[in-house]
């Protein structure tokens, strides 16, 4: 293989009958067919449920590098299910993924996922366990006739980018130091508790001196 990008230039010392140990990839086309057949078999097995599996929550990617993007998470938090009015045990039976480890750190994420759950619930076609005796919440016979299996992801998540029109850069924007501002904000957040503790101790010492 030719060197790729800025990696180390290798000096391969071939010993140990290396021709017998060459990694081959001849099973790739057959593996592709096998995966496709497995997907189709799974879709038939879980029909009429969505072929892609249960609905996933909207989550933000971690770290400063990627946190402007959203993607599908593992499962909805217990708080999101509670606000949406869905029991955690019922959720798994109607195609909603649940992750009890997840915590909501912002109101925006909570509201977005609660809205997503409510929208999913309104569009859901629920088949009765016994066709002869449908229960409350099950879909009507007309809806069941029109129901088809969803092949793609359930309510796909899209990153929406708002384009800005070209304009003249202001003097204030030119003088703004973005990196320094971010570092300062991060330092202030890190030192908030320490500074509060120091201020409290200083205030207590002043009270003692006055006595």
From Swiss-Prot:
Q: Which UniProt keywords apply?
A: Acetylation, Cytoplasm, Isopeptide bond, Phosphoprotein, Ribonucleoprotein, Ribosomal protein, Ubl conjugation
Q: Which residues form a coiled coil?
A: none
Q: For this chain's UniProt record, which GO biological process terms are given? A: translation
A GO term from the CC aspect: cytosolic large ribosomal subunit
Q: Name one GO molecular function term.
A: RNA binding
Q: Where does it live in the cell? A: Cytoplasm
Query: Which InterPro entries is this protein grouped with?
Result: Ribosomal_eL13
A Pfam family cross-referenced in the UniProt record is: Ribosomal_L13e
Q: Which residues carry this modification: N6-acetyllysine?
A: 16, 177
Phosphoserine occurs at 77, 106
From what superkingdom does this record's organism come? Eukaryota
UniProt crosslink position (Glycyl lysine isopeptide (Lys-Gly) (interchain with G-Cter in SUMO1)): 174
Q: Where is this cross-link: Glycyl lysine isopeptide (Lys-Gly) (interchain with G-Cter in SUMO2)?
A: 123, 145, 174, 177
Describe its function: Component of the ribosome, a large ribonucleoprotein complex responsible for the synthesis of proteins in the cell. The small ribosomal subunit (SSU) binds messenger RNAs (mRNAs) and translates the encoded message by selecting cognate aminoacyl-transfer RNA (tRNA) molecules. The large subunit (LSU) contains the ribosomal catalytic site termed the peptidyl transferase center (PTC), which catalyzes the formation of peptide bonds, thereby polymerizing the amino acids delivered by tRNAs into a polypeptide chain.
Its family remark reads: Belongs to the eukaryotic ribosomal protein eL13 family.
| Quaternary structure and interacting proteins, as annotated | Component of the 60S large ribosomal subunit (LSU).
Protein's name in the database = Large ribosomal subunit protein eL13
Q: Which organism is it from?
A: Oryctolagus cuniculus (Rabbit)
Taxon lineage: Eukaryota, Metazoa, Chordata, Craniata, Vertebrata
User: Gene symbol?
Assistant: RPL13
């Amino acid at each position: 293989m030719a060197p790729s990008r800025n990696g180390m230039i290798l000096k391969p010392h071939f010993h140990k009958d290396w021709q017998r140990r060459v990694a081959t990839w001849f099973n790739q086309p057959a593996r592709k067919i096998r995966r496709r057949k497995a997907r189709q078999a799974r879709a038939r097995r879980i029909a009429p449920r969505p072929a892609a599996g249960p609905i996933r929550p909207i989550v933000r990617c971690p770290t400063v590098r990627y946190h402007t993007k959203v993607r599908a998470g593992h499962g909805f938090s217990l708080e999101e299910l509670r606000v949406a009015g869905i029991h955690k045990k019922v959720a798994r039976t109607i195609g909603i993924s649940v992750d009890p480890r997840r915590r909501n750190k912002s109101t925006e994420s909570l509201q977005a996922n609660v809205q997503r759950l409510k929208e999913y619930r309104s569009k859901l076609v629920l088949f009765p366990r016994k066709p002869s005796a449908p229960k409350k919440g099950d879909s009507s016979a007309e809806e069941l006739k029109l129901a088809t299996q969803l092949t793609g992801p359930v309510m796909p998540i899209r990153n929406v980018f708002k384009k800005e029109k070209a304009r003249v850069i202001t003097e204030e924007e030119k003088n703004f130091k973005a990196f320094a501002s971010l570092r300062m904000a991060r330092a202030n957040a890190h030192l908030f508790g320490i500074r509060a503790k120091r201020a409290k101790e200083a205030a207590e010492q002043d009270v003692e001196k006055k006595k």
